[in-house]
Amino acid sequence: MKLGIVGLPNVGKSTLFNALTSTQNAQAANYPFCTIEPNSGIVPVPDARLDKLAEIWQTDKKTPAIVEFFDIAGLVKGASQGAGLGNKFLGHIRECDAIVHVVRCFDDDNIIHVVEDVNKPESVDPIRDIDAIDLELILADLEVVSNRLGRQQKAAKTGNKAAAAEAGWLAELASWLEGGKPARSFDFDEGDDAQKAVRKELGLLSAKPVIYACNVGEDDLLGGLDENPYFPLVAARAKEENAQAIPICAKTEEDIAGSTQEEKIAFLQEMGIESTGLDKLIKASYELLGLISFLTDGKKECRAWTIKRGTKAPQAAGKIHSDFERGFIRAQVIAYKDLEDADFNYAAVKSKGLQRTEGKEYVVNDGDVIEFLFNV
């Protein structure tokens, strides 16, 4: 799973990336385009269930699910026409499965802000900033859709019914984009396989699912968000788009990223919060794409495996090894909650009949602890 961290220059993208990866790989500087080529980093998905199983088994190896993040260059007006690093920026987004849009929600006169409002110079306006990036993605999509629409309209004139059908919904989509609305909020026909195939081919940038990472000040973490005038605006926008808005102080997260687990716990207790903004962001990113984890356990290794929600047992087994799917016989399944309720007494779980035998049609649930039986 690949997620692109995007935003206007100087909103905290590289600082957030450094915190996510606990590195200083991304140059964080107060000027546009300090990121040119995207930095990438593999980030583990926090999972207390996996941590507990590893503790119980005293396992030799613990392997979490992962997310790959890309720190993508800052965007400026005109990127869809190649301004700034526009073409590279848009190409890098196209390669990602989803977008983490970092939005500035703090005041600091020392930080340059690239997008200016003639009526409010150097002002902080997260909705304006969101619209600035959305517009460039929408314009890039409109060009792609218009080109395809022109070809299909031409083919439709020859009596090609499939082309005529495609031209119909493409025209509606083009009109939607022309209205300044992203493709992610367009009413696609999810039951139309032909439409799905075209959408995949088009690779629409503004159709990619998005999480808004609201970069707030440290004072907002200490005093709560009640006094922050910007976060509620982004949260409302996210609700309209069926997206998520997560408050995070990128600089603070970067400062504690290299701390020990004990130090992080002490920090959270001092701040009066349950989890870091990074943990919330990583989990939200994982869920954004409809992903879940099933678990395998044992002394040799405890591991979280990533699958799409709705995956059946044989295909889940195939994530471990293709032979597991090819020779699938059955799966021995324990729900993590049942294991937890039994104080991780495996014998008690089995004696109560809570270890289930499931076949090829079983749909794997998040947190299932599974042993696969196969024969090839």
Where are these regions (language model features)?
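Conserved G1/Walker A P-loop phosphate-binding module
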Residues: 1-121, 127, 134, 151-152
